[in-house]
Amino acid sequence: MIQQESRLKVADNTGAKEILTIRVLGGSGRRYAGIGDTIVATVKDAIPGGNVKKGDVVKAVVVRTRKQSRRPDGSYIKFDENAAVILKTDGEPRGTRIFGPVGRELRDKKFMKIVSLAPEVI
């Protein structure tokens, strides 16, 4: 359950290490984001020479959450950390590599490029 002010690890090679959620997209009163949901965030920690700098406002998609997520078959999935992948304006990932596993829900939400770059889809 990602909400405003939540901090997430960045799971790609854009140069950002941590982002802070500004807004959950998808409706005016939407409070929480789960796996596959898009957020607006600001970069809180970045490495020198990366594609993004500290203070940049970016869009990102949530790929891992600590809060368990219920699937249609009745099973639950949860991860050890909250993580996101930074997106371009057209919805494609800004980085060229994805680190760590991602949820299968991304395939249903049409983030096929992220699914294909990820080392593991759970």
Curated annotation (Swiss-Prot):
What are its GO biological-process terms? translation
Q: Which SUPFAM superfamilies match?
A: Ribosomal protein L14
Q: Name one GO cellular component term.
A: cytosolic large ribosomal subunit
HAMAP family reported for this sequence: Ribosomal_uL14
Give the family per the record. Belongs to the universal ribosomal protein uL14 family.
Stored PANTHER family: 50S/60S RIBOSOMAL PROTEIN L14/L23, LARGE RIBOSOMAL SUBUNIT PROTEIN UL14M
What NCBIfam families does the record point to? Answer: rplN_bact (TIGR01067)
Q: What is this protein identified as? A: Large ribosomal subunit protein uL14
Look up and give the organism this protein is from.
Micrococcus luteus (strain ATCC 4698 / DSM 20030 / JCM 1464 / CCM 169 / CCUG 5858 / IAM 1056 / NBRC 3333 / NCIMB 9278 / NCTC 2665 / VKM Ac-2230) (Micrococcus lysodeikticus)
Gene (name only): rplN
